[in-house]
A protein has these predicted regions:
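Terminal targeting signals and extreme-terminal segments of soluble enzymes
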Residues: 1-155
Length: 155
């Protein structure tokens, strides 16, 4: 027997998805840095988001691999989008990143952020950054603070 979702629950899921899409579209429209870096939003849902970019020669450091800030920026953007999908204006208060594999020019990176835990005021997120071969090239963890403001009311 297949479990069924109650009609009211389906409506709630659809509403949460639409809110997530609206919030992220609004944030991306104002995010000139992410646009300049060539980032794209590839997936959005309640408390999750994925972003993508292709590493260009201008993004490499003196060792010929991508500067750590490239993966960090991509992961941080996915994190920001994911933790704002519930509609509250939410800000990063702590994050860290590990780079288990090199990133080279031409790599297409996808950062996928997911909520690991939530409280009334804090959200804890994990972001995996993978290359086009599916290899994890960066692991990011972030803590976010939920303000009292909602999207559309920010100053």
């Amino acid at each position: 027997m297949t479990p069924r979702t109650a009609p009211g629950a389906r409506a709630g899921i659809k509403t949460a998805q639409l809110l997530a899409e609206r919030v992220v579209a609004g944030m991306m429209a104002k995010d000139l840095f992410s646009q300049r870096m060539g980032m794209q939003v590839v997936n959005v849902g309640p408390r999750t988001a994925a972003t993508r970019l292709t590493v260009t020669p201008e993004m490499v450091n003196g060792f010929g691999v991508a500067h750590g800030a490239v993966a960090f920026a991509l992961a941080d953007t996915a994190f920001a989008f994911a933790c704002n999908t519930h509609g509250k204006v939410t800000m990063s208060i702590e994050n860290s990143i590990t780079y288990p594999a090199p990133i080279v020019p031409g790599d297409t990176l996808t950062a996928t952020a997911v909520s690991e835990a939530e409280s009334r005021r804090l959200g804890y997120y994990r972001v995996e950054v993978r290359n086009q071969r599916g290899e994890i090239v960066a692991l990011f963890r972030g803590t976010a603070y939920k303000t009292k403001n909602t999207h559309g009311q920010e100053r």
